[in-house]
């Protein structure tokens, strides 16, 4: 009896395996959801869709459910979301342009000029060109046309070749193309070349601008009149009959003040509107980034509004366009 060693009671084989098997460090697999995860702050609990016994966790939405956040695909691994959609623009993303709502077509109105029917003043903002500041290379002018609500009405772009721009500078002939929110060219302004080296008072040397709306159909002209003291222009119809006059200040190079060009009737008594070149401080003195305010009556004929609008660009090229060599002196 003394030589017999007591033994423990025998246990089933299954219990022995459970005791000797080391614990699995991997957690159980998460439950499978037939849904898409959306980044961003968790929203309110979404009621369960038809066919699901219970609600889904916060931040999960079924594919059939509309959500307020777009779906994003992870790029280059898992990274935190630094920009919430709709909050701030992403890096290298241009700011969207707010356009003026497009009006309905009107009878007896050239297509594209319906915007001017609703306005009594517009702002002409020239783009700042850093290349012209750093070099002597003249670039094509670009302008943004906006209303009082800072909504874009038109975009004006110069279409002149490099040789003509840099050879003739401010005296260059040019073509300005006016486009709307759909990118359609609704107006064209052309300035022919005029030689002013022989006699500035000669009729053949006077500047002229032709306005076409739609392109190819002339609606009027802006013609310069020689005057010893001030800038004087005539706004003419398609038959070159004088309709209005534009009278500028005695000095258009006033520093620290606005330059006002008054639009008057032919007899000079009635004041119809104005073209004001705004003084923008050092930016006006050093760069070609002019700002014009154009005012006209709300009930003025839309073609005459377009002619006053066109006169603004002829004034800009003749008196406020600074070539790079002149600015460096």
From Swiss-Prot:
Outcome when changing residue 277 to A: Markedly reduces nuclear localization
Cellular localisation: Cell membrane; Nucleus
GO biological process, any: plasma membrane phospholipid scrambling
Major location category of this protein: membrane
Membrane topology: Single-pass type II membrane protein; Lipid-anchor
UniProt-listed InterPro entries: Scramblase
Motif Nuclear localization signal per UniProt: ranges: 271-283
Tissue: Expressed in heart, brain, placenta, lung, liver, kidney, pancreas, spleen, thymus, prostate, testis, uterus, small intestine and colon. Not detected in peripheral blood lymphocytes.
Function: Catalyzes metal ion-induced ATP-independent rapid bidirectional and non-specific movement of phospholipids (lipid scrambling or lipid flip-flop) between the inner and outer leaflet of the plasma membrane and participates in the redistribution of phospholipids between membrane leaflets. Metal ions bind to the calcium-binding site and induce conformation change in the protein. Has a greater affi nity for Ca(2+) than Mg(2+) and Zn(2+).
Name this protein carries in UniProt: Phospholipid scramblase 4
């Amino acid at each position: 009896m003394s030589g017999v060693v007591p033994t423990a009671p025998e246990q089933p084989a299954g219990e022995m395996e459970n005791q000797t098997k080391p614990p699995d460090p991997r957690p159980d697999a998460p439950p499978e959801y037939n849904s898409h995860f959306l980044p961003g702050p968790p929203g309110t609990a979404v009621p369960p869709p038809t066919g699901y016994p219970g609600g889904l966790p916060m931040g999960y939405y079924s594919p059939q459910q509309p959500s307020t956040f777009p779906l994003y695909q992870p790029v280059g691994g898992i990274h935190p979301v630094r920009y919430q959609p709709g909050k701030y623009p992403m890096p290298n993303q241009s700011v969207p342009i707010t356009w003026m709502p497009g009006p309905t077509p009107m009878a007896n109105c050239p297509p594209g000029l319906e915007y001017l029917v609703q306005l009594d003043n517009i702002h002409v903002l020239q783009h700042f060109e850093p290349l012209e500041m750093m070099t002597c290379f003249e670039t094509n002018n670009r302008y943004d046309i906006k209303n009082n609500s800072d909504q874009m009405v038109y975009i004006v772009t110069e279409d002149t070749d490099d040789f003509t721009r840099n050879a003739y500078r401010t005296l260059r002939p040019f073509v300005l193309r006016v486009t709307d929110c759909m990118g359609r060219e609704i107006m064209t302004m052309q300035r022919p070349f005029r030689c002013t080296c022989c006699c500035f008072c000669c009729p053949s040397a006077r500047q002229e601008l032709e306005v076409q709306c739609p392109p190819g159909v002339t609606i009027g002209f802006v013609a310069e009149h020689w005057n010893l003291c001030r800038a004087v222009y005539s706004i003419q119809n398609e038959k070159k009959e004088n309709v209005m006059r534009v009278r500028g200040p005695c000095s258009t190079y006033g520093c620290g003040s606005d330059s006002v060009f008054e639009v008057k009737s032919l007899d000079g008594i009635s004041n119809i509107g104005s073209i004001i070149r705004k003084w923008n401080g050092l930016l006006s003195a050093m760069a070609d980034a002019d700002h014009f305010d154009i005012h006209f009556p709300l009930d003025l004929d839309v073609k005459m509004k377009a002619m006053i609008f066109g006169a603004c660009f002829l004034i800009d090229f003749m008196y406020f366009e600074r070539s790079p060599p002149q600015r460096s002196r």
